[in-house]
Amino acid sequence: MLPSCWHDDLYRLLQNAGIPVVMLDQIPASMRHFPVDCVISDNYKGGALLAEHLLEKGHTKVWIMEQYLDAYTIEQRIQGFVDVYQKNGIDLLKQQDSFPPVSFGSTAETVIQSNLHFQKLIDSSDPPTAVFFDCYLSAMGGLSAASQARISVPQDISFVCFDDDPLFKTMSAAMTCVSQDLTSIGKHAVELLLKRIHGDYTDFPKIDMLDVVFHPRLSVKDLSGHNSTTSGKD
């Protein structure tokens, strides 16, 4: 089951009917009261990896493009990202106060609102040197806005994204990102579901957290004085 948000507890109806449930890409807020199996990616680690990369490249003024904060996965990506900067004495959330927060609630809205918000961001008197998109949909909106404004990545601004997309590799400056193993998520979920169907609940509730993969590509400008861009390959 793929819940719509953190507070989506409709899975209880299935459980009450005796139907085994495995949640994908989410740990529901009602987990304490209504336990359920979950298969997710290590969202916190993914956010942290991207933050470490930006810091290594000298980026201290970074904007986080949010997408539907009412979700465990998004919250963890942002938390991992923010914590890395916090440990290095930089309060990113305080920097965010310079701009109104943005939250997107649907697929279409995410792309559109990301586009509009990015336009306002680059027109501000003190724009960031890098933007962290916490999902590929918000990145699509940002890329569209950058193209419309004739902004060059990474010469004018740097991008990183949690999630990968085939389009990212075709860009003139391929997007630096963290990817999830969606095939593995599906496989683990099916294996866990079959286990429950056969009556084995010895490890219930189980949270199966899968690793993510970091792809340092060319969308981050090096402000540290070593190189002009990242030189990593996918």
Identify the function of each model-found stretch.
Residues 5:
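Active-site core of PLP-dependent enzymes with the aminotransferase class I/II
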Residues 8-234:
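Bacterial carbohydrate/catabolite-sensing allosteric modules
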